[in-house]
């Protein structure tokens, strides 16, 4: 297969001469005709997972693909047992196995999970021993935001920006990507809302609005007045001397502010960029807002 798809060299294979031309032809067809039709996320996942599998096979001198289903089953069982020894969750392991099966299927080589019911049951039993979900982010509830507002020193620009970040995040229930993408023209002060042009849950592509409280409006207004920002990104990078930059904050900088918040408030949990979103949802539930309305947020 093309180097575009495989980044691991000298991987053991056990493909019979009679199968080799078909396998090469199928993989070439995948590269030339099908690969670019897939979404970037799908391509990235398949490529990452399969190259990880190939690396495992190389390190353990096991044939990655074989004409003999029993050879493939031995390799795949060893790989499954390896994945089970890691900290990967249920769905991550299933995805990695699915990626291996995808390339076996493309090659039209025997799939041990299809050929052996016992191996399929073994795999399901093993994977089901793993937690099926990642632990949910600890919610930053409304009372924590109130504590933030009481404790944050908003005289320095970094403290004022923190207040804008956390209040906007819990009000709008925006994801980190939406927060970082806020521009001044997205903010409607009169109607107390912020427009997000893109959303993970917005299938229509029309964008969505997030509500902002009077407290948040006042903080944003103070931030704009102090910084002189008139257009462009709302949440800007700050230099070491707290000079406002033209560029928007990056994700790693946003995450660092959440970590700093834990130290400031002596929180017993480690907040993440998802904590304000979870906290906002919890608050909405407690205030009687319907599940349908929350799902649209």
What is each of the regions a protein language model found here?
Residues 39-57:
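Hotspots on structured nucleic-acid-binding interfaces, especially in canonical RNA/DNA-binding domains
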């Amino acid at each position: 297969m093309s180097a575009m798809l495989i980044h691991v060299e000298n991987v053991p294979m056990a493909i019979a001469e009679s199968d080799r031309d078909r396998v090469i032809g199928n993989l070439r067809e995948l590269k030339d005709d099908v690969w670019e039709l897939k979404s970037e996320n799908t391509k990235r996942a398949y490529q990452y997972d399969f190259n990880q599998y190939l690396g495992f096979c190389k390190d353990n001198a096991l044939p990655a693909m074989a004409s003999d289903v029993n050879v493939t089953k031995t390799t795949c069982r060893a790989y499954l047992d390896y994945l089970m020894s890691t900290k990967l969750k249920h769905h991550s392991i299933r995805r990695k196995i699915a990626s291996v099966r995808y390339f076996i299927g493309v090659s039209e080589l025997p799939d041990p999970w299809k050929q052996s019911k016992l191996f399929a049951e073994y795999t399901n039993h093993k994977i089901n021993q793993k937690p099926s979900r990642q632990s949910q982010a600890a919610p930053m509830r409304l009372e924590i935001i109130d504590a933030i507002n009481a404790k944050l020193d908003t005289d320095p620009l970094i403290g004022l920006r923190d207040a804008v970040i956390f209040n906007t995040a819990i009000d709008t229930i925006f994801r980190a990507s939406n927060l970082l993408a806020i521009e001044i023209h997205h903010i409607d002060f009169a109607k107390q809302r912020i427009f997000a042009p893109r959303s993970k849950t917005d299938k229509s592509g029309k964008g969505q609005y997030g509500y902002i409280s009077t407290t948040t409006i006042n903080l944003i207004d103070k931030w704009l007045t102090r910084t002189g920002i008139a257009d462009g990104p709302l949440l800007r990078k700050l230099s070491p001397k707290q000079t406002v930059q033209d560029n928007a904050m990056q994700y790693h900088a946003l995450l660092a502010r959440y970590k700093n918040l834990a130290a400031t408030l002596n929180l017993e949990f480690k907040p993440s960029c998802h904590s304000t979103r979870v906290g906002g949802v919890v608050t909405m539930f407690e205030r009687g807002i319907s599940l349908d309305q929350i799902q649209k947020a």
